[in-house]
Amino acid sequence: MVSHPMEKAANGASALETQTGELDQPERLRKIISVSSIAAGVQFGWALQLSLLTPYVQLLGIPHKWASLIWLCGPISGMLVQPIVGYHSDRCTSRFGRRRPFIVAGAGLVTVAVFLIGYAADIGHSMGDQLDKPPKTRAIAIFALGFWILDVANNTLQGPCRAFLADLSAGNAKKTRTANAFFSFFMAVGNVLGYAAGSYRNLYKVVPFTMTESCDLYCANLKTCFFLSITLLLIVTFVSLCYVKEKPWTPEPTADGKASNVPFFGEIFGAFKELKRPMWMLLIVTALNWIAWFPFLLFDTDWMGREVYGGNSDATATAASKKLYNDGVRAGALGLMLNAIVLGFMSLGVEWIGRKLGGAKRLWGIVNFILAICLAMTVVVTKQAENHRRDHGGAKTGPPGNVTAGALTLFAILGIPQAITFSIPFALASIFSTNSGAGQGLSLGVLNLAIVVPQMVISVGGGPFDELFGGGNIPAFVLGAIAAAVSGVLALTVLPSPPPDAPAFKATMGFH
């Protein structure tokens, strides 16, 4: 285990605190694998969030142009929760360790959130929602509360899990790469399981009581998926934390005999004031990258149901239109499963491919252009689907096979740049924080702001922006393609290259 005493930076006036001291030997590989497995449980639930919850909230009665607002809670909680959790997990003096208490708290919050989301329709109906009169305002309120708690829980889990792996690796380059390779692998496992569950039409039969008067087929499947998700998360978390112990951490006293203690917000703002040019460039490229990614991550399955399959998710839509939409959403979940498989294999090859292409920044720049091309190709797939419906009188059976295959191919190819997005920015942040002596938790929290601020912008403006250009999802996808291209140019031209022997080059991490 790593024991990091906290010391003031050398100039004495710094708002950043550094973590220094003797490093213990890295832990055994089986313990690293055990902690990495928590990523499968977290990512199972995150996959369900991405694939099923945007369509579901529209079925409850929120119009498409406002559906993205439900995601606003995610960036806000990420902006506040992850840096705060990172800060306090770096300093936690619990007898159970620095990271484990936060992981347990996060798993408990996920459990609460899952029940609120899964039973939102049932609770709303019991409180007075009419089954045939949308919008179901009470169900929407319960759903939004659960959604908010779920995002807080995910952010409470993710940061300490990442930091725990760094602690277990004890600064050893080989163990760091190995630990994060396994973290990446289990992320892919969770994604595949989550998207596979979301694509299966009759999953509710595994838990038949999930279908009720107020919870239809789609709702029952979603409820069952989340039950499976929380079961997996609780099992892997319990096993990992019982097996892998942490040493309690004690802060090193300062010259006056007291432990150093800088107020959190003073430290976080101080971190921004002291950022060097490499970190600023990383934040800019990361922000543009997420402006490109987030519209697609929010609306990929909605795009399949609405533009590709020609369905309608509005609460007042016909049963036939809703069926087409649900078929498209399930096809989108299948596409996301293919995406997760490609992401998993690509993650294992990031380090090797990066070396062959001449470094991390060149690899990131190249895959950002792949992202831009794929987002632009959604326009082509959409036009082909629209032409088919026009030529076949509305095509109530969905798109032809070649259109569906084209859409699924885009999902799969996008796994390549997504693997890089989940790895290189976090690896570079770890490298820069190591060079400056800043705590891993705080540094990853600062990088997280470059992810959540674009998410907030898209959550607030995505729906109205689409509506301004005629509705649907394509306008935001085109904007994303432009942002991806700009991000690629900046990654190749202004982003500094990390040292070739950087220990955390392959630090693959998730996001929330």
From Swiss-Prot:
Please give one Gene Ontology molecular function term for this protein: sucrose:proton symporter activity
Q: Which GO terms describe its biological process?
A: sucrose metabolic process
Annotated control of activity = Inhibited by protonophores (e.g. dinitrophenol and carbonyl cyanide m-chlorophenyl-hydrazone (CCCP)) and SH group inhibitors (e.g. N-ethylmaleimide (NEM) and p-chloromercuriphenyl sulphonic acid (PCMPS)).
Name the UniProt key words of this record, in alphabetical order: Cell membrane, Glycoprotein, Membrane, Sugar transport, Symport, Transmembrane, Transmembrane helix, Transport
Membrane-side (Cytoplasmic) residue stretches:
1-31, 87-100, 160-177, 245-278, 354-362, 429-440, 495-512
| Described purpose of this protein according to its UniProt entry | Responsible for the transport of sucrose into the cell, with the concomitant uptake of protons (symport system). Can also transport other glucosides such as maltose, arbutin (hydroquinone-beta-D-glucoside), salicin (2-(hydroxymethyl)phenyl-beta-D-glucoside), alpha-phenylglucoside, beta-phenylglucoside, alpha-paranitrophenylglucoside, beta-paranitrophenylglucoside, and paranitrophenyl-beta-thioglucoside. May also transport biotin. Required for apoplastic phloem sucrose loading in source tissues (e.g. leaves) in order to transport it to sink tissues (e.g. roots, flowers).
The record ties this protein, via NCBIfam families, to:
GPH_sucrose
Q: What is the name of this protein?
A: Sucrose transport protein SUC2
| Organism expressing this protein natively | Arabidopsis thaliana
Question: Which gene carries the instructions for this protein?
Answer: SUC2
